[in-house]
Design a protein with these regions (language model features):
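NAD(P)-binding Rossmann-fold cofactor-contacting core
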Residues: 29-49
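Hydrophobic/small residue at the entry helix of a nucleotide-binding pocket
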Residues: 16
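Short amphipathic alpha-helix with an adjacent loop that forms part of the alpha/beta core around
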Residues: 66-77
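N-terminal glycine-rich "phosphate-gripper" loop used for MgATP/nucleotide binding
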Residues: 81-91, 95-97
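Rossmann-fold cofactor-recognition segment
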Residues: 52-65
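Rossmann-fold NAD(P)-binding glycine/threonine-rich loop
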Residues: 92-100, 108-143
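C-terminal catalytic/substrate-binding lobe primarily of soluble NAD(P)-dependent oxidoreductases
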Residues: 166-311
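Adenosine-phosphate binding glycine-rich loop
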Residues: 126-194
């Protein structure tokens, strides 16, 4: 178990936040008097108390672009930890503040303030600029910052590595070079050697509906704001180096250098064929950050030239 003596602020207490709170004490040994939960929803107080939280450490506050620094600095100092489960908040702004204040920060996914309908491609480039800025400084960003490490992009990125390792160990048992690549975490070179061209990340909800189901009704089990944003944004793909784009008229823009492709159609109007363990299904092509981060992590370069990247 990890011992942590500093303050911990959990920002957000929805379904995922509650699940995390229930389990965090099994992973981290901390002082319960130093664990704070910040949420805008006063109705979360009862489940927070039922899960063993201290009443005085429950902070009901609507976090905005104008007040987030003022609220967070009451509970966080250098070396403390901010765990972000919130939506419609400015990831980039919070990241910058944490880096400047030397506060550890981890969040589950990309977000921005409600007034900004953002591009995941542009946000990715801006995050890379911030990474370069803070990585070269000796006075700030002294503690780890991990972005987008929820189920996806986070967990599915580990699944990709596990999948590559599984293919190598089951279909190429005698390939010693592949074993060495996996052993030394060179998954990009392993994917290149295996000739992996496309990776699908799929969500399929198999929960039963206790109601008369018909195709005119949407039963949503995901965060409403995120679902709204993702379904009404243009579909995106990160294109591999092998791709020959013969549907350019359907594209809003293509950036071959980074592999960014945005279609003119929104996700609600764009379906594609995909698979899950029980077979094929038609899914909506929804934008999500792992299309960028997984493809980027598996790039192989010769000098400055990208010679391999899967879609």
């Amino acid at each position: 178990m990890i011992n942590f003596d500093g303050n911990i602020v959990q920002f957000g207490f929805g379904a995922v936040g509650k699940s995390f709170y229930e389990k965090v004490s099994k992973e981290i040994h901390f002082n319960e008097n130093k664990y704070f939960v910040i949420t805008a929803n006063k109705n979360e107080f009862a489940p927070y108390i039922n899960l063993g939280g201290l009443a005085c450490n429950f902070i009901e506050s609507e976090i905005t672009k104008d007040n987030f620094k003022e609220v967070f600095e009451k509970y966080l100092n250098s070396g403390d930890l901010l765990i972000d489960f919130a939506d419609t908040v400015g990831t980039k702004d919070i990241l910058s503040w944490c880096a400047e204040k030397n506060i550890m920060y981890i969040n589950t996914g990309e977000a921005d303030w409600p007034e900004n309908w953002y591009s995941i491609f542009n946000e990715n480039l801006l995050k890379n600029e911030l990474k370069e800025k803070y990585c070269n400084s000796s006075s700030v960003n002294k503690y780890p910052i991990v972005l987008q490490h929820g189920n996806n992009p986070g967990l599915v990125s580990h699944f990709v590595k596990a999948g590559i390792a599984y293919i190598a160990s089951t279909q190429y048992k005698k390939d010693k070079h592949l074993k060495e690549l996996i052993k030394h975490n060179k998954f990009n070179e392993a994917a290149y050697k295996l000739g992996i061209k496309m990776i699908h990340v799929n969500d399929i909800d198999l929960q039963k509906v206790n109601d008369n189901y018909n195709n005119d009704t949407l039963f949503n089990t995901w965060c409403i704001d995120s679902f709204f944003f993702e379904m009404l944004s243009e579909s995106t793909i990160n294109i591999g180096t092998h791709e020959n784009i013969n549907f350019k008229d359907d594209c809003k823009f293509i950036d071959y250098a980074n592999g960014f492709l945005e279609l003119k159609r929104i996700a609600l109007d764009q379906k594609c064929n995909t698979y899950y363990p029980n077979g094929g299904f038609d899914g909506f092509l929804v934008l999500h950050e792992e299309t960028i981060t997984i493809a980027k992590s598996l790039e192989v370069k010769e000098g400055e030239n990208v010679i391999y990247r899967p879609s």
